[in-house]
Amino acid sequence: MAAAAAMAEQESARNGGRNRGGVQRVEGKLRASVEKGDYYEAHQMYRTLFFRYMSQSKHTEARELMYSGALLFFSHGQQNSAADLSMLVLESLEKAEVEVADELLENLAKVFSLMDPNSPERVTFVSRALKWSSGGSGKLGHPRLHQLLALTLWKEQNYCESRYHFLHSADGEGCANMLVEYSTSRGFRSEVDMFVAQAVLQFLCLKNKSSASVVFTTYTQKHPSIEDGPPFVEPLLNFIWFLLLAVDGGKLTVFTVLCEQYQPSLRRDPMYNEYLDRIGQLFFGVPPKQTSSYGGLLGNLLTSLMGSSEQEDGEESPSDGSPIELD
């Protein structure tokens, strides 16, 4: 029995080697076609092979071939063909119900980074990639994928979209460094404190207390226009500092007095008090309002920020909640 099992294993290994060798030969032919400029023919052959492999349940071979093909087309400036094969990479992951792994997330982020930032395919790709990476949990996507997307968007100086993805990652330090660059290159000197205040409040609304603390500490230490603190010259920064301490303590009276004392600073952005209402519920036991007083844009923003995090009150999670609309 043992000998038979060993022989079967050896045969399987030989078949696997032959299959991989076959894939490599096919890849070589396809690469030669692309190098010659026969883009259309090569693209159609990639698609044909994809569906053939998928019908034979060779999901890994299909995915790896589409990934290498996408990179090849990107290197030759063939955006449409590359984007199409990138979608097929996702299709293989979805249909085979492949488990999330760091290497796969990095491959998806690599493809994303090579796509034309203005292409509609990129929007579709990132939406599907995040959905797959959530593993059917109903979350907003894997924090690691969000981090990788945020880093790419930061390099492209797409700060608003980068901030969105950082908020759903676990990378508070990266978020802070991006916000420092965002503030110094695009913001007004008078708004230095507002960049980090919004991020901290939104992290807290997503029950990510750890990243909220890291983003505040890193930002205030590294921003060239912020003097050493605490305490800080800017009242809003002092409020955020006290708020983070209060969240750790969990005392409602401290939170209430803090919000009352700093109302002049909090009135600088109408969303601050909306965020603080939610933070009061999450960390200080404040009961939800019976009837929502939020309407229009503010109501939509708050609803989209809270999302599924309302269903879970006990644990911190960087991926809780629904998408945050960023201005």
From Swiss-Prot:
Chief location bin: cytoplasm
MF GO annotations: protein carrier chaperone; protein-folding chaperone binding
Effect of residue 266 to A: No effect on interaction with BAG6
Swiss-Prot/TrEMBL keywords: Acetylation, Congenital disorder of glycosylation, Cytoplasm, Disease variant, Phosphoprotein, Transport, Ubl conjugation
Residues with N-acetylalanine modification: 2
Result of altering residue 279 to M: In CDG2Y; uncertain significance
Effect of substituting residue 259 to A: No effect on interaction with BAG6
Effect of residue 29 to D: Loss of interaction with GET3
Effect of residue 182 to A: No effect on interaction with BAG6
Post-translation changes: Ubiquitinated by RNF12, leading to proteasomal degradation. When unassembled from BAG6; ubiquitinylation is modulated by BAG6 quality control role and effectuated by RNF126.
GO biological process: ERAD pathway; maintenance of unfolded protein; post-translational protein targeting to endoplasmic reticulum membrane; protein insertion into ER membrane; regulation of protein stability; tail-anchored membrane protein insertion into ER membrane; ubiquitin-dependent protein catabolic process
Xref: PANTHER family: GOLGI TO ER TRAFFIC PROTEIN 4 HOMOLOG
Disease involvement: Congenital disorder of glycosylation 2Y: A form of congenital disorder of glycosylation, a genetically heterogeneous group of multisystem disorders caused by a defect in glycoprotein biosynthesis and characterized by under-glycosylated serum glycoproteins. Congenital disorders of glycosylation result in a wide variety of clinical features, such as defects in the nervous system development, psychomotor retardation, dysmorphic features, hypotonia, coagulation disorders, and immunodeficiency.
Assembly description: Component of the BAG6/BAT3 complex, at least composed of BAG6, UBL4A and GET4/TRC35. Interacts with BAG6; the interaction is direct and localizes BAG6 to the cytosol. Interacts with GET3.
Protein name: Golgi to ER traffic protein 4 homolog
Gene from which the chain derives: GET4
